[in-house]
UniProtKB/Swiss-Prot annotation:
Pfam families: EF1G (PF00647), GST_C (PF00043). InterPro entries: EF-GSTs, EF1B_G_C, EF1B_G_C_sf, Glutathione-S-Trfase_C-like, Glutathione-S-Trfase_C_sf, GST_C. This is Probable elongation factor 1-gamma. Residues 211-221 have a biased composition (Basic and acidic residues). GO terms for molecular function: translation elongation factor activity. Keywords: Elongation factor, Protein biosynthesis. One of its GO terms (biological process) is translational elongation. Probably plays a role in anchoring the complex to other cellular components. The gene is eef-1G. Residues 210-248 are annotated as: Disordered. The keyword Protein biosynthesis applies.
Amino acid sequence: MTGKLYGNKDNFRTQKVLIAAKLANKTVTLAGDAAPADKFPLGVTPAFEGDALLFGAESIGLHLTGTSANAETVQWLQFAEGYLLPAVLGYVLPSVSAANFDKKTVEQYKNELNGQLQVLDRVLVKKTYLVGERLSLADVSVALDLLPAFQYVLDANARKSIVNVTRWFRTVVNQPAVKEVLGEVSLASSVAQFNQAKFTELSAKVAKSAPKAEKPKKEAKPAAAAAQPEDDEPKEEKSKDPFQDMPKGTFVLDNFKRSYSNEDTATKAIPHFWENFDADNWSIWKCEYKYPEDLTLAFMSCNLINGMYQRLEKLKKNAFASMILFGTDNNSTISGIWVWKGDKLAFELSPDWQVDYESYTWTKLDAKSDATKKEVNEYLMWEGDFGGKKFNQGKIFK
């Protein structure tokens, strides 16, 4: 089998395919960074043109390796792309100044990645490779998704707690088929740090290189259509903001969010919250996950929170939350503190928000109570006794 591959040769996704081709003894030739639009209208790379037209590193890799890939391999591809890679990029990109830096968000991704690596480390205690006794597409996919982390943020100190993952990673990247594509891989000697000047410079380069959208040419309207009153055209009805009719109040949520993101939580953000919170027009709620017995691995439990946040995106304008996973793998709980406008359950205001909330019990807290203030402060800082529960990791909705 021979074929053309479209994609940046230095991109880890393209490199996955090049390595898979070598493992399968297939000939794949790089044909440029961009895929031809007539054959790949979605514009996704890497893209493969050969005995089939395919896009995406995993699908192309599976196609090239053929029958050597089994269900066990596929599960690792899904783990790498669905769970591991988002945490890697969420931690690495801001650290190398390729994305804007928000301390708490980066800390979330760092904790999530560390949790996943601890699980993977236990899997690899007695294994040389992920599937079988030889290098496979599973190893290539997981290792390449971890490559940015090992290059930029997993320094010697971080690697001490994941000795099995590090040993396995070194084994994979030093295999001839992998080394031929990647060259010599150097591991991070220190954790990359965000640099505002570098971020500004990189952002300017990206903006400059972005293709400018062409303005559509205006076509002359037929006389009959031009004479038709504009009011006859159907107008798209805007959905009403569920919070629209509520009193505005004095608490400016965006100001608190900025303080929480950019200033010290204990000395700045928390005092700002309590000095400005408007208990007459806003409320504080605590939630507890109803089914802790169903929670297994920590990173999978965190994805429950991530999914909930994604589905509640439109609620962000009028809400803030700190959700925390407590405990360890197969022995954990989830609870959180939420703040939103109004004194009723916000989820009941819109059908779009009634997806996850029924999996939690909700308790309205007394904003004037010292006990409430203590608990809210703990959830904002991710520090405290938490009623005896052991903090694992937290996620912020803002």
